[in-house]
């Protein structure tokens, strides 16, 4: 029936979030990449006609000129383009499953965001698309001392445990202003 074929064709056109983390049995293999001819902002200097070498998902070299390409590297010519470091979001509430606020008591320093990280939150993907590479996940402001934060490296398709940055410092959220008054 032609009507059924038309409906099926139309329904497959509109996918509003990526499938990568859903339905695949493994995460895509990291490839070797060299970005050349870029204007690179390092945070300390601006490098004109610079190159960045990425091997096995890690940046191994940043500098002026061209460098030896890693084996089987994909080469990206970034002439006229800019490359910057990833953005670190120091105050975020993404990737938290039903645990932003602990409002039962004024002090809840014993609770931890690490226990409620949601690795399937579509906002991880959206943050990555906007250049955010790491986030500090904080409790809300329903009480003055809301609990322990978590620092994650944004990686779409990973488990909650694999999002956590190794040997991260521990922090507790304090909210000593109008938010606490408004939420109670």
Regions picked out by a protein language model, each given a short descriptive name:
Residues 21-30, 40-51, 64:
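Acidic, glycine-enriched loop/beta-strand segments at the rims
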Residues 1-37, 68, 75, 92:
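Extracellular/periplasmic ectodomains of large secreted or surface enzymes and adhesion receptors
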Residues 44-84:
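Histidine-rich, glycine-flanked metal-binding segment
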């Amino acid at each position: 029936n032609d009507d059924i074929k038309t409906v099926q064709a139309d329904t497959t056109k509109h996918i509003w979030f990526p499938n990568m983390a859903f339905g695949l049995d493994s995460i895509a293999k990291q490839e070797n990449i060299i970005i050349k001819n870029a204007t690179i902002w390092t945070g300390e200097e601006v490098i004109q006609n610079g190159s960045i070498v990425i091997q096995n998902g890690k940046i191994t070299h940043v500098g002026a000129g061209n460098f030896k390409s890693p084996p089987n590297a994909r080469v990206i010519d970034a002439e006229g383009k800019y490359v910057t470091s990833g953005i670190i979001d120091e105050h975020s509430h993404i990737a938290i499953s039903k645990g932003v606020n602990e409002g039962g008591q004024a002090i809840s320093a014993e609770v931890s965001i690490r226990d409620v990280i949601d690795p399937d939150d579509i906002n991880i993907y959206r943050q990555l698309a906007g250049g955010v590479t790491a986030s500090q996940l904080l409790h809300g402001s329903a009480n003055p001392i809301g609990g322990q934060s978590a620092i994650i490296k944004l990686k779409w398709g990973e488990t909650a445990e694999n999002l956590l940055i190794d040997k991260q410092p521990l922090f507790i959220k304090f909210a000593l202003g109008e938010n606490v008054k408004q939420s109670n």
